[in-house]
Amino acid sequence: MNYLTLIAAASLLTAGTESKKDGYPVKEGDCAFPCGYDNAYCDKLCKERKADSGYCYWGNILCYCYGLPDKAAIKGYGRCRPGKK
């Protein structure tokens, strides 16, 4: 019976919470946002998408966000296809 009470309490505490993820935000066609080494631009872009913060990842010269909502679209493994939704 104690296990049932513990599980019920844990379920109530986690109800309504959102998980967060990190990644490259994307626009149409699974295309990431180029940043040209501008950290301020990426931080603003990420916060507009409800992330905690963001920066310009120098290896790819693309914006990378920390703490995006779980429903936010991030870059997958496919190619960028401009013009496709």
Curated annotation (Swiss-Prot):
Domain LCN-type CS-alpha/beta, residue spans: 21-81
Disulfide partners: 31-80, 35-56, 42-63, 46-65
This protein's record includes keyword Protein transport: no
Pfam families noted in UniProt: Toxin_3 (PF00537)
GO annotation (BP), single: defense response
Keyword Methyltransferase among UniProt keywords: no
Modified sites of kind Proline amide: 82
Tissue: Expressed by the venom gland.
Keywords of this entry: Amidation, Disulfide bond, Ion channel impairing toxin, Neurotoxin, Secreted, Signal, Toxin, Voltage-gated sodium channel impairing toxin
MF terms in GO: sodium channel inhibitor activity; toxin activity
Cellular component aspect of the GO annotation: extracellular region
Residues spanning the signal sequence: 1-19
Subcellular compartments: Secreted
Domain notes: Has the structural arrangement of an alpha-helix connected to antiparallel beta-sheets by disulfide bonds (CS-alpha/beta).
Protein task: Alpha toxins bind voltage-independently at site-3 of sodium channels (Nav) and inhibit the inactivation of the activated channels, thereby blocking neuronal transmission.
Similarity comment text for this entry: Belongs to the long (4 C-C) scorpion toxin superfamily. Sodium channel inhibitor family. Alpha subfamily.
Name the UniProt record assigns to this protein: Toxin TdNa8
Gene source species: Tityus discrepans
